[in-house]
Amino acid sequence: MGRVGTDVSQAVLNLTVEAAPNPWQGDLSLRNDGNAGSGEWRALGVTLKNDLLAPGDTLLMVGELDADQQAELGATISSISYTAPLSEQLKFTGSFGYSRRNLVEADGALRNLTTRQFQGYGQLEWVFKDSSRERWSAFAGISGNRNDSFLSGKSFSSTGPGGWNQTGYARIGASYGANQGRFSWNASVYGLQGMPSFSSDVQLQELSLLGIHPGDSRALGGSLNLNWFLSSTLQLSLRGSGQVAFNELTSDMGFTLGSDTGLKGLPGTYVSGDSGYLWTTELTWTFWTNRKMALQLAPFLGAGGVSSQRSLGDFSDTVGSGGLLLRWLANRNWNVELGWISPFDVEQMPYWEDWLLGSGVYTKLQYRF
């Protein structure tokens, strides 16, 4: 504090204020709902950093390892995403993902099958309104996908030469979210359009034999999520999503069912198709708590279905799962879940009938930082 002359009323106070840096955030978890064929156990890590290079930007990194009961590595999955603000209303997100899967749970020649995938995505988001109570936005993006297949280390492919398939599509839509005290919800709608320019002429010819013409591949979809705090100890969560394909779609445009899309009690990816629907509901009851820990019971139920049409024939399938979870939360860092689950409309359980999950037991250990 400095003083002008001898008059204390003319004193000047100079303050230097620096914004507190945003810490790294994330979580590490171990679960038993891996991917059928690649292993029951999955280790998942997520880390996020806001204001990394500029105010308002976000870096997100995700990594996953899947292994079978003999600790043989079956899948490696990773992705990185960066969101940069271009203006107060416009944001750009670029992401890149990589995965490699081995069928370590298979027998015979299938055990030597390996698939590798690269995926890139770029999206512009225009935020119309963003307040403490609601958020409106529109988005448009382009996705490119490449799949490589290997059998005993040698490339092969059912579409195109060289052992690789490449496809892409455009995605455009809008989203809305609102927070009304104890009640919050968000919804989104989107449209998909295949882009044949991502595929070679030979690949387009091979896809056409399956009835797939990327230039004609189109779909509409949407999702709705609701969260309602019925009381200080009861929370109801509802979710629904769906997609309708107007023509045959490439695999990267499909609709997927599994625990990765909210159906607890199933492998990460169970089944996919061009069109599909999904609904889930969960009621969380916090029946005991103190200043550092809490215990919760969470009954859940969900189901979905997919369908596809091909020149070789039509395909459709439905699946569901219900159960009860016991959840222990400690110090805002630890989350331990143990549950009984019961899948239904499951005619076969290839590779996962011998899992703990196949016996009706679900487990999860998570640490947040």
Which role fits each region the language model picked out?
Residues 47, 328, 333, 340, ...:
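Outer-membrane beta-barrel "beta-signal"
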